[in-house]
Amino acid sequence: KLPEAYAIFDPLVDVLPVIPVLFFALAFVVQAAVGFR
């Protein structure tokens, strides 16, 4: 069983691997917007 304190951070751990993907996607969109302008 997980500790109660860890249960609070469980959603954060679920989101953590997605952050670099979102950052890469954001950078790609910015580059595309600047490139097409």
From Swiss-Prot:
It is found in: Cellular thylakoid membrane. Residues 31-37 are cytoplasmic. InterPro entries: PSII_PsbK, PSII_PsbK_sf. It is a single-pass membrane protein. The chain crosses the membrane at residues 16-30. This is Photosystem II reaction center protein K. Pfam families: PsbK. Belongs to the PsbK family. Its main location: membrane. One of its GO terms (cellular component) is plasma membrane-derived thylakoid membrane. Residues 1-15 are lumenal. PSII binds multiple chlorophylls, carotenoids and specific lipids. NCBIfam families: PRK02553.1. One of the components of the core complex of photosystem II (PSII). PSII is a light-driven water:plastoquinone oxidoreductase that uses light energy to abstract electrons from H(2)O, generating O(2) and a proton gradient subsequently used for ATP formation. It consists of a core antenna complex that captures photons, and an electron transfer chain that converts photonic excitation into a charge separation. PSII is composed of 1 copy each of membrane proteins PsbA, PsbB, PsbC, PsbD, PsbE, PsbF, PsbH, PsbI, PsbJ, PsbK, PsbL, PsbM, PsbT, PsbX, PsbY, PsbZ, Psb30/Ycf12, peripheral proteins PsbO, CyanoQ (PsbQ), PsbU, PsbV and a large number of cofactors. It forms dimeric complexes. PANTHER family: PHOTOSYSTEM II REACTION CENTER PROTEIN K, PTHR35325. It comes from Thermostichus vulcanus (Synechococcus vulcanus). GO terms for biological process: photosynthesis. Keywords: Membrane, Photosynthesis, Photosystem II, Reaction center, Thylakoid, Transmembrane, Transmembrane helix.
